[in-house]
Amino acid sequence: ELESGERIEGDLFIDCTGFRGLLIEQTLNTGYDDWSHFLPADSAVAVQTESVGPPVPYTRSIAHESGWQWRIPLQHRVGNGMVFCSKFWSDDEATSKLLGNLAGEPLTDPRVIKFTTGTRRKHWNKNVIAMGLASGFMEPLESTSIHLIQRAVIRLMQMFPYDGVRQPDVDEFNNQMKFEIDNVRDFIILHYHVTNRRDTKFWRHCSSMPIPDSLQHRIDLFRET
């Protein structure tokens, strides 16, 4: 039901309402698995700057005391941001660090974004399928969000409920999405956990924090071989 009172009916709904999850969470109360204990970064500050010289053909990810900075060259500007953990840096500290490490003049004011890394307990619940930020959030260290959206779209095309929603299809969709998202989660955690950096409380925390059994298994296999 819309704010106007108009009622929209349908057999299948795709929830693309971002962090709010208007259908998957606020309507269906699907639940959210919080992964902050695995990926402690919970904030970002972003700013656009002028380009300085020809754009390089890659994105830079630069480690800092309590997080990391992105620098993305675009056609007419550069995207910059700092991902950080609010337990170790305040918004002002992160913003100051970012502004002190820019290559060009800022074009926009810094904008702070808060997030909770994690995933919906079900991506497909009843006749609602969550995609994008409505399905969960993975910090942008490897820009995996677009990949996960593409995978969800392809999977829905392969399993589209032409004859109506059936629970076995729903369960299989959720199982496949969970497997894929868990792999991406472990991939991102690995960047933090296996680093040799120990010079700040943040990096010492990352090296000693608990990790999923699935990732520990892979690390053990790698070390044994």
Predicted segments, located by residue:
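A short acidic-Thr-Gly-centered motif at the start of a beta-strand
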Residues: 2-7, 119-125
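Short catalytic/ligand-binding loop motif for oxyanion handling, primarily in non-cytosolic enzymes
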Residues: 21-24, 138-139, 181
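Solvent-exposed, non-transmembrane amphipathic alpha-helical segments
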Residues: 33, 91, 100, 148-154, ...
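Beta-rich nucleic-acid/ligand-interaction surfaces
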Residues: 117-118, 173
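Long, low-complexity C-terminal extensions of enzymes
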Residues: 158-225
